[in-house]
């Protein structure tokens, strides 16, 4: 346990940030999974809507500093590629 007052405060803020980032990453994984399920089911309209929603969530995560912009771009690109491979 830290003895310095500022370090005790940082422990609290770091824990809050960790939980916030964990919630954001969890939401990203959920949206990605929903998208992949729709693609596997062959629902093109649903997959397109889910792709837009997931892309928006990735952009929000970048804005909040949870993900690096290149990481989000890579994930969005992979999802778009999967969507475009649907017949």
UniProtKB/Swiss-Prot annotation:
It comes from the Bacteria. GO terms for molecular function: small ribosomal subunit rRNA binding; structural constituent of ribosome. Keywords: Ribonucleoprotein, Ribosomal protein, RNA-binding, rRNA-binding. InterPro entries: Ribosomal_bS20, Ribosomal_bS20_sf. The keyword Ribosomal protein applies. Disulfide bonds: none annotated. Residues 1-25 are annotated as: Disordered. Residues 1-11 have a biased composition (Basic residues). The keyword Ribonucleoprotein applies. This is Small ribosomal subunit protein bS20.
């Amino acid at each position: 346990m830290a003895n310095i007052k500022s370090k005790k405060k940082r422990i609290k803020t770091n824990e809050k940030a960790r939980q916030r980032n964990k919630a954001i990453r969890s939401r990203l994984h959920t949206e990605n999974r929903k998208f992949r399920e729709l693609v596997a089911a062959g629902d093109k309209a649903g997959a397109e809507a889910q792709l837009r929603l997931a892309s928006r969530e990735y952009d929000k995560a970048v804005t909040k500093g949870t993900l690096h912009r290149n990481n989000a771009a890579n994930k969005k690109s992979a999802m778009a590629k999967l969507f475009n491979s649907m017949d």
